[in-house]
From Swiss-Prot:
Positions that bind Zn(2+) 1: 167, 187, 247
Keyword vocabulary terms for this entry: Glycoprotein, Hydrolase, Metal-binding, Metalloprotease, Protease, Secreted, Signal, Zinc
Recorded GO MF terms: metal ion binding; metalloexopeptidase activity
Gene3D superfamilies to which the protein is assigned, alphabetical: Zn peptidases
Segments forming a coiled coil: none
CDD domains: M28_like
The name this protein goes by in its record: Probable zinc metalloprotease PTT_08196
Main location: secreted
Signal peptide as annotated in the record: 1-18
Fibronectin type-III domain span: 396-483
InterPro entries in the cross-refs: M28_fam, Peptidase_M28
Family: Belongs to the peptidase M28 family. M28B subfamily.
Record-level GO cellular component terms: extracellular region
Length: 483
């Protein structure tokens, strides 16, 4: 283990307010869920300190901006149109047909993914991962469930993996009705189209770490495909450091006609599930006030920092919940497997266009029809996903063994971590915020060391440690537990 240390008494605190900096991004801001939520600096300034500087979000570099610009609303529209053309993509609709049902959709998705991979010079591969699901909840007879996975293998750290999925199965009102048309244009051809579009873009840009882009099945019947994928990765000891679930990301208009075209919600669970964290660690997390600093919430903060900007044209509204109220999604299986995972969903769902038989009643059109999809909005959500995934993959790995010394009773904070021996790590940053702030508000670069003493009380702020790459990309922060 390599430890180096630094002790700080004070440092320059910049007078600029994060609100003032971010307000120059010239975005429409129907909802603010980042530093722009603060009406003035005073809200972010307690406890007062002359340590560090106010945190400025990581800007996309020229390469990432160019990649984000490649995400095409026209391509996404064409993909959703094709997926809708299969009539139904119900998990049980395993018809012997090349034009209708989930198998036909699966084969087309795989064919398109392979076309993209052919442009990658061998850095992207495509796999159709299948298994037979026996009779279970919402599965009245054995059925083959298939996930289509495009893997962009990392050039420098291929064993560090990030996953993004959308589900390509669909449904109508009766979850067991696999005969009727179930277009599923928004739920979730929109997320599937984003996964496919990102595969197209990433085939031409090899990331430093591995990115898996998946179209998964069985979601509407009980998250079967994604859970199988998560367990397969866990069983092979795959180091998944983040998972993004795109589900119902195709409409900017709510059921009351309200429009919010520049915001995407990011749902992030608090304390990890009992399958992912020991009871002792869970009890300690609650004792020290770490319930808002789970790996999932650090991932959501990271996405808000790197993907809410004028390159994507979007804001990321973090929601402190596993999912919508009493609902679930394909990130759940990853969380249960111990992986950080979040869900993106449009800001205002229209339930007349979700899980509905196609019909018109009293002048209201029901059904998940393509006419209700906003392709420009969906493309912007794709840009958020791309900016998040690329920033994760290009950054160094998260710091390991991050601890805070609780043996000394004073108003300094002593934080320790293992210094990486990787040459892509330039330094480490301590980030912090008040206990009521959603996002990190302050930062201090302490160099390539493994120990720091700060004149800030651990009683008053929340700390995190993140790695800074030689390329300028920064990892998600890691919350320190008592040593």
């Amino acid at each position: 283990m390599l430890f180096r240390s630094v002790i700080l008494s004070n440092a320059l605190l910049l007078p600029a307010c994060a609100h003032d900096i971010l307000s120059n991004l010239d975005l429409s801001l129907p909802i603010a869920a980042n530093a722009e939520s603060y009406t003035d600096c005073a809200n972010a300034a307690w406890p007062p300190s002359n340590v560090g500087v106010e945190l400025v979000p990581q800007p996309p570099d020229d390469q990432l901006r160019a990649m984000v610009d490649e995400v095409s609303a026209e391509n996404i529209e064409a993909t959703i149109t094709k997926l809708v053309s299969f009539g139904t993509r119900h998990t049980l609709s395993t018809f012997n047909s090349s034009t209708r049902g989930i198998n036909a959709a699966r084969d087309w998705i795989a064919s398109e993914m392979r076309k993209y991979a052919a442009e990658s010079n061998g850095t992207m591969t495509v796999e159709v991962q299948s298994y037979v699901q026996s009779v279970a909840s919402r599965i009245p007879f054995p059925v083959t469930i298939s996930n289509v996975l495009a893997k962009a293998t990392g050039s420098e750290d291929p064993n560090r993996v990030y996953v993004m999925t959308g589900h390509y199965d669909s449904r109508v009102t009766d979850v067991l009705n696999y005969e009727s048309d179930a277009p599923g244009a928004n739920d979730d051809a929109s997320g599937t189209a984003i996964a496919m579009e990102l595969a197209r873009v990433l085939a031409k840009h090899q990331p430093k770490s591995t990115i898996i882009l998946g179209a998964v099945a069985g979601e509407e019947q009980g998250l079967y495909g994604s859970t199988y994928l998560a367990q397969t990765l866990k069983n092979t000891s795959t180091n998944v450091e983040g998972m993004l679930n795109c589900d119902i990301v195709g409409s900017s208009t709510g059921d009351r006609g309200q429009k919010d075209p520049f915001t995407i919600r990011a749902f992030a669970q608090g304390p990890p599930p009992i399958s992912a964290e020991s009871s002792a660690r869970a009890a300690q997390r609650l004792q020290i006030g770490g319930e808002n600093d789970s790996p999932a919430r650090e991932l959501a903060r990271f996405s808000a920092e790197v993907a809410a900007n004028n390159a994507t044209g979007m804001n990321v509204a973090i929601i402190y919940r596993l999912d919508r109220f009493l609902r679930g999604g394909d990130h759940t299986g990853f969380l249960q497997a111990g992986y950080p995972a979040i869900r993106y969903t449009e800001p205002n769902e229209n339930f007349a266009h979700q899980h509905q038989d196609i019909r018109t009643e009293n002048g209201t059109v029901y059904g998940d029809l393509i006419e209700f999809v906003d392709f420009d909005f969906t493309a912007r959500v794709g840009k958020v996903n791309l900016a998040t995934l690329w920033s994760l993959a290009q950054a160094p790995a998260m710091p390991r063994n991050v601890t805070i010394d609780a043996t000394i009773l004073d108003n300094n904070s002593r934080i320790k971590w293992i210094v990486s021996n990787k040459t892509d790590v330039a330094s480490y940053e301590v980030v912090w915020r008040s206990t009521i702030a959603s996002l990190w508000t302050h930062m201090l670069d302490v160099g390539k060391v493994g120990y720091v003493v700060l004149p800030l009380s651990k009683d008053n702020v929340i700390f995190g440690i993140r790695a800074v790459g030689t390329n300028g990309f920064k990892s998600p922060a890691v919350y320190p537990f008592p040593a």
